Amino acid sequence: MPKSVIITCAPTGGIHTPSMSPHLPITPAEIATASIEAAQAGASIIHLHARHPETGKPDPRPELFQQFLPVIKQSTDVVMNVSTGGGLGMSMDERLLAATSTSPEMASLNMGSMNFGIFPMLQKYTEFQHDWEQPFLEMTEDFIFPNTFKTIRYAIEKLGGDHGTKFEFECYDLGHLYNVKWFVDQGLIKPPFFIQMVFGILGGVGADSDHLTHMHNTADKLFGAENYEWSVLAAGRHQMPFATQSALRGGNLRVGLEDSLFIGKGELAQSNAEQVTRIRSIVENLGLTVATPAEARMRLALKGGDQVGF
């Protein structure tokens, strides 16, 4: 019998800017509402960033996370996954601050340094509400997103060791899987672990179904299919097709306005819940079931919602 599909929703992220969609959650209240609605629609994990409530700029301050994490916890049983990616240009200490302050069940962790180019968005968006938006996009033409072996080890030991937090290991290219393997071999990553395969970011692996097949096959060879859970996210218009392919292949998936602002060609998603509802319908029409938060916790061996710091 096929495993149920774990749906992660990433409601705001740190890539899109407020001028790109009026539906992008910005304030703590908006992020809380978007997360609760996504959980009610079928997401079992919520991947969370924070933003400055007035400007919408990615903001790592723990006090912002503390304004929405408890609200989400009070309203749902969803697993909360705090980003350590933060916003482009943040130091590793800044990126870890929210997670080390809140001790979540899960945190994301990028598994390799890379070019992270979102500057092509400037070809589409030319008018901005806030002064920071255009320079933020422009700087990524000459920017390397740093995730060294030393900083990855630090994050694993700090969050995993000190807090019992487990990771969503974000792999933007084939080599990132081998980086995960190195840490597995060192005994720093233990099964069951969670691999998020990311497609369609300029600087990472392209959104081609052949690459999805190769990434999945390589992960099986490196880790053994019984030792890990895998999930797929794809940027922009590739979001739903790649999520569907992952479900068909026995994997899990991620949607949300962090990864795509749209629900269809040229049509902005009105909410994160709209995307979750769409992919849940697809999954169920394929004869598959959607995982509950309890099922996600069991399969990922999480510490439980009663062990967090919020």
Give the residues covered by each predicted segment.
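N-terminal small/glycine-rich loop or linker at the start of catalytic domains
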Residues: 1-23, 124-132, 138
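Alpha-helix-loop-beta-strand connector modules within alpha/beta enzyme cores
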Residues: 9, 57-82, 155-159, 215-225, ...
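Histidine-centered catalytic micro-motifs
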Residues: 9, 33, 43-55, 79-81
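Active-site mouth loops of central-metabolism enzymes
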Residues: 11-32, 84-91, 141-146, 168, ...
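Glycine-rich, proline-tolerant flexible connector loops at the mouths of alpha/beta enzymes
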Residues: 19, 44-66, 198-203, 261-265
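Conserved, mostly hydrophobic/aromatic
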Residues: 31, 38, 49, 107, ...
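Catalytic alpha/beta core domains of metabolic enzymes, predominantly
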Residues: 106-258
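Structured C-terminal cap/extension of enzyme domains
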Residues: 178, 217-221, 241-310
